[in-house]
Amino acid sequence: MLGVAAQRRGDHVAAIAWFRRALVSMPHDAGLCIGLGISLFEVEEVDEALILLRRACELAPALAPAWFNYGKALEKQARMEDAAVALQRALDLDPSHISTRLSLARAQVSLGRIETAVAGFREVLRRDPDNAEAWFGLSNLNTFQFNAADAARLQRAFGRKDRTAEDRELLGSALAKALEAQGDYVHAFEIFRDVKASQRQRVKGSAAGEQRRVQTIARTFAQALPAPLDVQLGQEVILIISLPRSGSTLVEQILASHPQVEGANEIRDMQLVVDAEARRRGSAFPLWVPEATAEDWHRLGSEYLARTAHWRKTKPRFTDKNLLNWYLVGASMTMLPAARAVMVRRDPLETCLACYRQYFTGNAGFACDLDDMADYCINFMRLTRFWLEKFPTRIFDLQYETLIADPEATIRRLLAFCGLSFDPACLAFHRTSRAVLSTPSAAQVRQPLRQDTARSALYGDKLDRLRQRLREAGLPERDPKPEALL
C-alpha cells in the first residue's frame, strides 16, 4: 500500500493523504485507521490521531496492534493510566509481543508501580535474555540495583559482536551501572566512555555553536522589551528551568503535590510556539525578537495558553518542565508577563557526572564527552545568571543542595514565591499519585529525599579535568556530601 510505503520512508504528509483516500472507500478498515492515526500523531495532529486509533480498537477489538498503537499514543500524551489499560489489553491478546511488554513496563514505571515494572522487564529477559531495552529499562530505575549474576549476563550480552550500535550502547549503559553496584568504578568508567564515544558518532553537537547561540540570546534580550498589553497573562504558568539530572523532576513533584497545581511533565509547547513564529517570520530565534511588538508577544502568549489549556481542566495552575526551557526564559517571560519560573541548579560537578552516566535518547551530544558536558554546563550557568539579573522578581533560584539540607523551609519559600499557600502534601511529595514521565527519576520521586547517592568522589582522578574546567569557569566544586540524584 502506498500509504504504508510513505510512512516507512518518513513522509507522513503523503501517508496521510493516501490513508484518507483509502478510508473513503473502506471506512471500517481498522488497519487504515491505525495507519492514519500513526501518521497524524507524527505531524502533531494529536486529537484526530487518538480518535482514529481508538476507532481501530472499536472496529477490531481482538486486534492486538490496534490496542498497542493506541496505548503508545496515549503514553506519548502522558495519559499513563489509559495507556497501561490499552497496553495490557494488547498483551492479553498477544503475550508473545515483546514491544508491548516493554511499553507496558515503562508505563508502570511512570505510574510508580516499580515492582510490577521490574517483573515486566524480567519477563522480557526470560523470553529474550539479551534484550537491550529490558536491561536498560532496569538500569534506568535509579532505585534498582543489579546483582552479580546480572553483571555477568550483561557482560556476555555486551560482548556479542552481532548487536547494533544502539543495542550495544543500551547494554553498555546497563553494564556500567551493574559494575558500579559491584564497586568496580574503574571498569564502569571505561564502559561509560565507550558507550558515549559510540553515541557521539550519531548525534549532533557543537560546543562553539552552542556558545554562539547562548551569547546571541543574551545579547538580544539585554535590549529593552515592549511593555505587556496584559500584565495578568500567564499567571497560570510555573516554568521549571534546569539542566538534566539536577532536580527538576523532584521540584515538579513537590509543586504537583499542591492541590492547585497540575504537573504536566516535560512538554514542548513553548518551543513549538517559538519555532512556529520563526517559520512565520522566516527568521530564526532569537533574530526576530527585536522586531516583535507588544501585540506579537501577547499573541504568542495567548497561543501558548491555548495549546496548554488541557492541563488546566481540573486545577488552575500547571508546571512547564522542559530541558530546553533555559534558552527560552526571555521569550517565556515576555509573552507571559505573569508567569513565574523556578531555576533549579545543582552542584556542577555532580550534574556533569550524572549526565555523563545517563544514556539519553535523541540529540544530546552535550552529554557524550566530559569536555562537551563542561561547556554545556558553563553555558547554562552563564545564561541563567543573565536571566536572574534580567528578571530578578520573577525567577526563584533554587539550589538543590539547599532543598536537600532544609526541605521544609525551602518548600515554604518556593510555594510562597509561586503564590501558593503552604500545603503539607508538598512535604510528603513521595506519596503523590501521578504519572512521572522522566524515567530515571520516576522511581526516586516515590521515595523521601535520599542522602546517600553522591558519586563524583567515587571516580577520583577520572574527573580531574572536569573539575579543572569548572573551576576555571568560576564554578568550584562544592564540599563533597551525600545528595539525591533526581
Regions found by a protein language model. Give the residues of each.
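Phosphate-binding active sites in nucleotide-utilizing proteins
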Residues: 231-334, 340
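Helix-start (N-cap) detector for alpha-helical repeat units in TPR-like alpha-solenoids
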Residues: 12, 30-31, 64-65, 98-99, ...
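PAPS-dependent sulfotransferases, especially Golgi type II membrane carbohydrate sulfotransferases
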Residues: 136-139, 151-162, 171-234, 285-294, ...
